[in-house]
Amino acid sequence: MSLFDWFADRRKGQFVGKVTQESEESDGLWEKCPECGQVVYRKDLIDNCSVCSNCGHHNRIDSKERIRLISDPNTFKSINNHLTPVDPLGFKDRRAYADRLRESQAGTGLKDGVLTGTCEVNSIPMALAVMDFRFMGGSMGSVVGEKITRLIEHSTKEKLPLLIVCASGGARMQEGMLSLMQMAKISGALERHRDAQLLYMPLLTHPTTGGVTASFAMLGDLILAEPKALIGFAGRRVIEQTLREKLPDNFQTAEYLQDHGFVDTIVPRTELKETLAKILRLHKTQVVKLQTNA
């Protein structure tokens, strides 16, 4: 519902009671699309998976909302979400790393930047990890890496397909080499998952960059992406300065990567659950056929 439609409904008497502009703004009734500028009724935006109905812009959502959109109701069971990051290097730049952790934990209600667990998608069981960009830019530290690795190992043991929703600025610099080690650790766990002939799908959302892109985000059997998501390793400006060339306007977008074979399919958020269910059903059918033929 647009702002114009909302006022039209008020004139028809569908909304009762006096609501001031100040109370509307304070209650957060409206959202302005950062892409097209359309003012949208917040409830309608949420009902549409936080996708702008006017231009299709995918607004950023948190990990809990992502889980709600993907999984069947009340089927998500968390795994290893008790793990909490520490400050192994006593790192301090403009602020102490320990202070940044406390601030992110208070602001998000999470212990670190990823939620992991199992769920069902249209009654099909699946392992699920969802990164949360609100927590220090979704950066991958030792706890994020450990939780994802343990989830992969659990899905291998239980013979579950795996989906990792990526939203990250890359490795967490405040943990130095410990964060970079997670790239190899997760990649090794994924190789064992693949050896067990199990399905792994990364979903690349805006943004997916740095060490996450250079490791598990690009190791899927089927690589999914949201429309217009920023996907890359180094930043655009860094690449242009290094190459001394002007890059295409759509460089490092999901569409550009699909055109060049790095992304298999782009899935609008409103179609994600049904798309996942179709893929999972097809994979389950093929596994049964292989086992029968064996």
Swiss-Prot record:
What PROSITE patterns does the record point to? COA_CT_NTER
Q: How does it assemble?
A: Acetyl-CoA carboxylase is a heterohexamer composed of biotin carboxyl carrier protein (AccB), biotin carboxylase (AccC) and two subunits each of ACCase subunit alpha (AccA) and ACCase subunit beta (AccD).
Species for this entry: Prochlorococcus marinus (strain NATL2A)
Q: Which UniProt keywords apply?
A: ATP-binding, Cytoplasm, Fatty acid biosynthesis, Fatty acid metabolism, Lipid biosynthesis, Lipid metabolism, Metal-binding, Nucleotide-binding, Transferase, Zinc, Zinc-finger
The reply on keyword Transferase is yes
Q: Which residues bind Zn(2+)?
A: C33, C36, C52, C55
- Which InterPro entries did the record assign? AcCoA_carboxyl_beta, Acetyl_CoA_COase_Trfase_b_su, ClpP/crotonase-like_dom_sf, COA_CT_N, Znf-ACC
Which purpose does this protein serve, as stated in its record? Answer: Component of the acetyl coenzyme A carboxylase (ACC) complex. Biotin carboxylase (BC) catalyzes the carboxylation of biotin on its carrier protein (BCCP) and then the CO(2) group is transferred by the transcarboxylase to acetyl-CoA to form malonyl-CoA.
A Gene Ontology BP annotation from the UniProt entry: fatty acid biosynthetic process
Q: What is this protein called?
A: Acetyl-coenzyme A carboxylase carboxyl transferase subunit beta
The cofactors it requires, by name, are:
Zn(2+)
Family in the record: Belongs to the AccD/PCCB family.
Q: What class of enzyme is it?
A: transferase
